[in-house]
Amino acid sequence: MVKAVSSSKGAAKVEQKKSAARSGVKKNASKSQASLQDTSSPLKTSSKNAHAKKDVQAKGAVGEIKQVIGAVVDVQFEGALPNILNALETENLGNRLVLEVAQHLGENTVRTIAMDTTDGLTRGQKVFDTETQICVPVGEATLGRIMNVIGEPVDNVGPIATTKTRSIHQKAPEYVDQSTASEILVTGIKVVDLLAPYSKGGKVGLFGGAGVGKTVLIMELINNIAKAHGGYSVFAGVGERTREGNDLYYEMIESRVNVNPKDNNGSTKGSKCALVYGQMNEPPGARARVALSGLTIAESFRDEGQDVLFFVDNIFRFTQAGAEVSALLGRIPSAVGYQPTLATDMGALQERITSTKTGSITSVQAIYVPADDLTDPAPATSFAHLDATTVLSRSIAEKGIYPAVDPLDSFSRMLDPLVVGEEHYTVACQVQTILQRYRSLQDIIAILGMDELSEEDKLLVGRARKIERFLSQPFHVAETFTGSPGKLVPLEETIKGFKGLCAGDYDDLPEAAFYMVGSIDEALEKGKRLIAEAAS
């Protein structure tokens, strides 16, 4: 079709151009009928959703490509120009290509950003205005599926069985619709619920390097929210490695968060998480919009009364892609080369992640800090929106304590006696005080040994080591690796256990009794068993 449309470039008269456009639409329709009969390829499967809209496309204005520079495509129209953020469609090497209008130039020309590769486009090629913005499918049919930035399935399982779609560009909820109540979202993970609790509708920054358990923690959060709250999750891979995205998909199936369509006659019914990927190799337009696509799906669940967990990995790459798009559009960069609209772009995303009177979206965002510089504009802009941070420590992971959350570096604005209650706040402060004192004594212990400590400090060190181990917890999604069944611990049990540890109620139990258990009752049983084994 590209050649057929391109050959009309030499036509000089307006009537000839219109005739070529009409013939191009007819050829496009015949191609779509042929592709509907072949579902073996994910690209052809994806094109089903695209060709379903051909009638709408034909009603919109028809333009012509005038210039292609990387991911930027200039399109000229004869009449009225498409609105800013409108989606334009053309065909590139047999595949559907979506262009998003970014600027209105002179001479009836718009500048657009491509959502896929522009290799193969030619000047004079016809482009159709869809008269709407980029829309993605929403609803329960998206659960268990992998989609790209424009909502096409890329998991080779067939089309997404829904007719409900929503524009990726939505306004933040009105003030009157937002919920002002401060409520904890219990995750069932002891270290998070006690020391850095998440709030419904809150935003959490997840800091962690490679191999410290970030992916496992993300998967456990998805698993626990789904089981304890009956809620859904959405994972947006922004600039992700393809390998990591593939691993996450299959790990979710193995841990029963999602249903394997191959084992369920092609159906993903019963799945709890939708995945939207804009991979590292994709153009900046796709990486800059994929977070909005994922958020749109999460918003639809929230508006249906669900408590949704929304993951973004990595929020820095969202900013990075925005900087690339800004440079391609010719904007003058601001500090450190970032786009001048950095704060606006970040605010437009973050302000949509909020609770309403019907449901909530809780966001967990992985954040990369360039060169460990927290003053870099990208992470600094993100920090302004965070309600809590969960820091994963390599030194804790080296001790074999998982989840490897640093109890002293992690914090939450929800840890306030007016929100969590006096007892919870007091116990959390006692735990942090003991661990902080233990950290300050570690140099003395390393040089002089435990014998040089006072009796009071020896007692404190013993409690601190038990607290450290009690902060560990077997995860459901890691059962195949640990051999231990996962534990979801209620908040009341968590507070009860750490309150007793701080008070010295369990000073007589061995440290090993507190390692990789759920509630304090399990630790007591394990301790009695260990003491009996040692006595025999």
Swiss-Prot record:
It is an enzyme of class 7 (translocase). InterPro entries: AAA+_ATPase, ATP-synt_VA_C, ATP_synth_F1_bsu, ATPase_a/bsu_AS, ATPase_alpha/beta_chains, ATPase_F1/V1/A1_a/bsu_N, ATPase_F1/V1/A1_a/bsu_N_sf, ATPase_F1/V1/A1_a/bsu_nucl-bd. Keywords: ATP synthesis, ATP-binding, Cell inner membrane, Cell membrane, CF(1), Hydrogen ion transport, Ion transport, Membrane, Nucleotide-binding, Translocase, Transport. It comes from the Bacteria. Its EC number is 7.1.2.2. Residues 30-49 have a biased composition (Polar residues). Its main location: membrane. It is found in: Cell inner membrane. One of its GO terms (molecular function) is ATP hydrolysis activity. It catalyses: ATP + H2O + 4 H(+)(in) = ADP + phosphate + 5 H(+)(out). Signal peptide: none annotated. The keyword Lyase does not apply. One of its GO terms (cellular component) is plasma membrane. ATP binds at residues 208-215. PANTHER family: ATP SYNTHASE, ATP SYNTHASE SUBUNIT BETA, MITOCHONDRIAL. F-type ATPases have 2 components, CF(1) - the catalytic core - and CF(0) - the membrane proton channel. CF(1) has five subunits: alpha(3), beta(3), gamma(1), delta(1), epsilon(1). CF(0) has three main subunits: a(1), b(2) and c(9-12). The alpha and beta chains form an alternating ring which encloses part of the gamma chain. CF(1) is attached to CF(0) by a central stalk formed by the gamma and epsilon chains, while a peripheral stalk is formed by the delta and b chains. This is ATP synthase subunit beta. It comes from Bartonella quintana (strain Toulouse).
